[in-house]
């Protein structure tokens, strides 16, 4: 049996992994006996019952305990050696990393120094540029102030000129007002004269109407007399014809009696019967002679009646001529009065116009006044153009001043921004110098540590922390610099956008100035045109009053033409009356003349009728051609053949019937019939319209929506689809 002490093992928290119970190991380092073949589960010795065994084994137990402590110390020392080796390796690795980081940081430090030098150079350049811009802006501002003062002086001068122009314009306006007052007075006098003349014309019209009525009554009376005379002449003609017949019979009887007397003279010389017959015949002769005298008297009366008719017509024509002459005389009197009024008005105008002594001076005076008006308008136009130019220059000055103020404000903002940038750069420089000093201290510590040859873990940790803090500061500094760069880029972009906007505004202003210059040139050309029109004497119908004569040349020519036409018609009527009288006087030739006249009229009317019939036939042919073209076009465009038929209802109302047949119809029975009456169109029922589909479409499109075109279009589409698709 060999007593052995097992190697110290760490107790595990898990009870199943430890080979011994926890009570045996924790009860005061009790001795465990191992054999060559140890038992799987040795039980601990019970020392509570046998005190003598415990006393016997005390020294051995102490030795074993010391041995175990030594072994534990040895194992811990080995472990510490291994740990120190690993730490040494890690420190060497950390040292190499720190050296690399030191080199990297030194490179960064040198790069930051270079950036700092570049920033200082940029700062100097920016300061110099800012000073140059400030000096330039101050110079521009002084120049703008000087130009403003000069323009103010010019403006004052222009204002004085404007006041002078306004005073001259006021005087011209006063003159124009005076002239307008005179014109209003003249227009008032002209209106009064017009009213008076209108009243005179109305009175003359009334008098003319009364005279016309009186003359009409006289004419009717004379016509009645003429009709009575004609009736009397007709009666006398009939009596004359009767007497002529009687006279002819008497002459025949006289000739017979003369023959008898000549025959009886040879037979019987003097007998009582013959004497009685002679006496009787003598009495009849006397009676016949009396009748002949009466017939001659009637004939003379008839001739007197015809002469009276002729005299009546002559008197009527004379009366008409006298009336026309009277109307002309009245018109001449009116024109004379108007001319006298115009002369009086012109005399008053001559008296009112200063510097005019005779009518020849009016033209000169008017030309002088026109020249004065033209000069005043030119002065007013020049003053207005100067005022516009001054306004434009003022606007330009104000814009320049605003631009200068804005530029000064921008320069101030830039200077403030540059000051803030300088302050920020100074702060950054202080931070960089602090970091530089820290890095120098770190480098010195590293050099000292390298010179000493041994570096403790705490010093390495402090160095690493210092490097990490410097790295973090450097990263923060880089981020700040990047943010500053971004801000500067944004500022530059804003400034560029502002510059672009200002350039666009400048371009717009230049375009506006050019457009204003073009407008000013156009207005000047219009002013020159108006001045030339004023010089030539052009006028507008809305503003200029023109004196017009009542009886102008056109009116007089029209009156002359109407008078000539009336005279020609009167001459024709006279000729016709003479022809009728000749026809009446010459009964034998009258029939022939009337027949020839009637035949001529009939031939003329036949010729006119023939020409009219030819024209009507030509119109009918042209209309038929056009209507056929129209029907074909309607058929091609709308798809329906249209046949029109007109008839009358029993009550006499005309009705037009239209028959429509689609070009896509499958049979001749597919026809639609419509009636058109006084603006209303209605569909008629037939076999095709009474079909189910057609009746439904008629109910929807015509009865409900009152749209015949929609019905025909839908029907066309359905028939087209049936014809082509099915």
UniProtKB/Swiss-Prot annotation:
At the highest ranks, the source species' classification is: Eukaryota, Viridiplantae, Streptophyta, Embryophyta, Tracheophyta
Among SUPFAM superfamilies, the record links this protein to: Mitotic arrest deficient-like 1, Mad1
Q: What does this protein do?
A: Required for the execution of the mitotic checkpoint which monitors the process of kinetochore-spindle attachment and delays the onset of anaphase when this process is not complete. It inhibits the activity of the anaphase promoting complex by sequestering CDC20 until all chromosomes are aligned at the metaphase plate. Required for anchoring MAD2 to the nuclear envelope.
Task: Supply the source organism for this entry.
Answer: Arabidopsis thaliana
Q: Where is this region: Disordered?
A: 1-30
A GO BP entry is: cell division
Identify the Gene3D superfamilies for this entry.
Answer: 3.30.457.60, 6.10.250.90
Thylakoid as a keyword of this entry, yes or no, is no
Q: Which residues form the signal peptide?
A: none
* UniProt protein name: Mitotic spindle checkpoint protein MAD1
């Amino acid at each position: 049996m060999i007593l052995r002490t097992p190697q110290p093992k760490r107790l595990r928290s898990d009870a199943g992994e430890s080979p011994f119970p926890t009570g045996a190991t924790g009860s005061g380092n009790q001795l465990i006996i191992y054999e060559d073949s140890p038992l799987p589960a040795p039980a601990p010795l019970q020392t509570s019952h046998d005190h003598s065994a415990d006393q016997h084994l005390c020294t051995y137990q102490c030795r074993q305990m010391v041995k175990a402590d030594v072994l534990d110390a040895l194992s811990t020392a080995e472990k510490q050696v291994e740990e120190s080796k690993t730490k040494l390796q890690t420190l060497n690795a950390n040292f190499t990393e720190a050296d690399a980081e030191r080199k990297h940081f030194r490179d960064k430090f040198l790069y930051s120094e270079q950036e700092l030098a570049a920033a200082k150079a940029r700062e100097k350049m920016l300061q110099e540029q800012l000073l140059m811009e400030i000096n330039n802006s101050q110079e521009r501002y002084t120049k703008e102030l000087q130009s403003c003062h000069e323009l103010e002086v010019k403006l004052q001068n222009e204002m004085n000129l404007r006041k002078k122009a306004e005073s001259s314009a006021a005087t011209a306006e006063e003159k124009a007002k005076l002239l307008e007052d005179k014109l209003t007075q003249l227009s008032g006098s002209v209106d009064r004269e017009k009213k008076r003349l209108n009243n005179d014309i109305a009175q003359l019209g009334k008098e003319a109407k009364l005279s016309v009525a009186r003359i009409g009554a006289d004419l009717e009376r004379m016509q009645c007399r003429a009709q009575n005379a004609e009736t009397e002449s007709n009666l006398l003609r009939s009596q004359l014809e009767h007497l002529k017949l009687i006279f002819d019979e008497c002459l025949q009887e006289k000739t017979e009696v003369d023959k008898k007397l000549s025959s009886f003279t040879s037979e019987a010389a003097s007998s009582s019967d013959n004497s009685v017959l002679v006496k009787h015949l003598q009495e009849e002769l006397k009676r016949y002679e009396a009748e002949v005298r009466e017939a001659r008297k009637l004939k003379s009366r008839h001739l007197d009646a015809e002469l009276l008719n002729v005299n009546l017509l002559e008197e009527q024509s004379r009366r008409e001529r006298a009336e026309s002459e009277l109307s002309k005389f009245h018109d001449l009197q009116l024109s004379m009065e108007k001319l006298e009024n115009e002369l009086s008005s012109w005399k008053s105008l001559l008296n009112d116009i200063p510097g005019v002594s005779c009518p020849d001076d009016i033209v000169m005076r008017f030309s002088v006044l026109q020249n004065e008006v033209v000069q005043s308008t030119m002065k007013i136009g020049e003053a207005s153009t100067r005022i516009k130019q001054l306004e434009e220059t003022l606007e330009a000055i104000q814009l320049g001043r605003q631009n200068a103020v804005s530029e000064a404000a921008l320069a101030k903002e830039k200077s403030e921004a540059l000051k803030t940038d300088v302050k920020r750069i100074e702060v950054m420089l202080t931070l960089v110098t602090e970091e530089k000093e820290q890095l120098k201290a770190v480098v010195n510590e590293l050099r000292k540590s390298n010179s000493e040859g041994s570096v403790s873990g705490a010093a390495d940790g402090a160095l690493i922390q210092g490097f990490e803090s410097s790295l973090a500061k450097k990263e923060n500094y880089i981020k700040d610099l990047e943010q500053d760069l971004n801000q500067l880029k944004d500022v530059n972009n804003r400034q560029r956008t502002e510059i672009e906007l200002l350039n666009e505004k400048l371009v717009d202003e230049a375009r506006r100035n050019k457009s204003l210059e073009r407008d000013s040139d156009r207005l000047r050309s219009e002013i020159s045109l108006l001045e030339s029109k004023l010089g030539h004497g052009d006028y507008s119908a809305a503003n200029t009053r023109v004196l017009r004569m009542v009886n102008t040349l056109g009116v007089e020519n029209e009156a002359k033409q109407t008078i000539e036409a009336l005279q020609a018609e009167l001459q024709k009527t006279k000729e016709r009356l003479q022809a009728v009288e000749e026809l009446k006087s010459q009964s034998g030739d009258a029939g022939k003349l009337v027949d020839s006249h009637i035949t001529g009229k009939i031939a003329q009317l036949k010729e006119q009728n023939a020409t009219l019939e030819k024209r009507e036939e030509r119109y009918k042919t042209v209309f038929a051609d056009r209507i056929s073209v129209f029907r074909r076009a309607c058929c091609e465009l709308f798809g329906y053949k249209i046949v029109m038929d007109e008839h009358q209802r029993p009550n006499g109302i005309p009705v037009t019937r239209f028959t429509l047949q689609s070009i896509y119809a499958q049979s001749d029975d597919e026809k639609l019939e419509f009636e058109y009456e006084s603006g209303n169109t209605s569909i008629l029922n037939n076999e095709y319209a009474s079909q189910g589909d057609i009746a439904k479409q008629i109910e929807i499109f015509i009865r409900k929506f009152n749209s015949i075109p929609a019905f025909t279009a839908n029907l066309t589409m359905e028939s087209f689809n049936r014809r082509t698709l099915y």
